Amino acid sequence: MSKLGVVSWGAYIPRYRVRTEEVSRIWGDDPLRIVDMYLVDEKSVEGIDEDAVTIAVEAARRAIRRGGIDPRKIGAVYVGTESKPYAVKPISSILIDALGLTNNVFAVDMEFACKAGSDGLVAAIGLVEAGRVEYGMTVGTDTSQGEPGEHLEYSASSGGVALIVGKDGVAAELEAMYAFVSDTPDFWRREGSPYPMHGEGFTGEPAYFRHVIGAAKGLMEKYGYKPSDFTYVVFHQPNGRFPVRAASMLNIPLDKVKPGIVVTHIGNTYNASALMGFAKVLDIAKPGDKILLVPFGSGAGSNAFVFTVTDVVKDRQKMGVPTVEEMLQDKILVDYAQYLKMRKMIKLFE
């Protein structure tokens, strides 16, 4: 029986960073209190010529290069984002031409807050498993924004991750997946509103923890896994505290979670958040390692996946594609004024 799973991965993090203390300086907040509250030292900021599309293209190109895959063999492209440059125009169709795919591709932009990219992973897995396409790709990409002066501004950031699914040359074999979803009003943005709103008390227990724990625990109970079975565990990372607490609630040792933590250095990249942690782990994983991946999306829902790393990962790690750790270290600090300019938050005229 052929394997099914992640054949290749690629990530992109913009080089620019704004530090938490710089944002807090502008708004008169205590930087030590803010850093302690969110465990976010700095966050990534897209360049003046970057958006969710360019970030997706770069992440996808890196995934294709790492896997040595003929892009014409990719038969499905899914994009998960909350940051579409166009209100009505898909990113997925742009990727088809930018990446050199054929026109006979299933292409869809997906929406479910920060877990839409992982929903694309589910869809790609289904098409590949059914034999409808040879390879499927999902991309989680965002240039997330928070209202200036509001606490979401300390974490909302930019980045993208692409995963290619197939049966040939699998680097991380899929073993199981599970979902937990409910109608929970923890986070939303109405049509025409420039910035999202969040339901304060709904964001923790009723939303993130209920769904992340529900998906992870449900998967483990259904398929007979124990915390000790996993080498690495990666959760969605809206801040630095939530994934650590989720691990504690599941009796998962912190040393299994820390290698996949990226939020401290780049903030919450939304659809790329959990996938970025997953990519970071794949950059260092060894054959036989088992990974539990649990993305989360407000509204609310969580997907859970278990992958086992294969011998192929060693070749993928040698392809000269930038690692997540390398991108975390390759940075240029900007001040708050530059940050506003890059994020196009200064309106010169309407």
Curated annotation (Swiss-Prot):
Binding site for (3S)-3-hydroxy-3-methylglutaryl-CoA: D30, C114, S155, T203, H236, R245, N268, S298
Domain of life: Archaea
Entry keywords, A to Z: Acyltransferase, Isoprene biosynthesis, Transferase
EC number, as in UniProt: 2.3.3.10
Pathways per UniProt: Metabolic intermediate biosynthesis; (R)-mevalonate biosynthesis; (R)-mevalonate from acetyl-CoA: step 2/3
Record field: catalytic activity: acetoacetyl-CoA + acetyl-CoA + H2O = (3S)-3-hydroxy-3-methylglutaryl-CoA + CoA + H(+)
Protein family according to the UniProt entry: Belongs to the thiolase-like superfamily. Archaeal HMG-CoA synthase family.
Protein name: Hydroxymethylglutaryl-CoA synthase
Protein source organism: Pyrobaculum calidifontis (strain DSM 21063 / JCM 11548 / VA1)
Phylogenetic classification of the source organism: Archaea, Thermoproteota, Thermoprotei, Thermoproteales, Thermoproteaceae
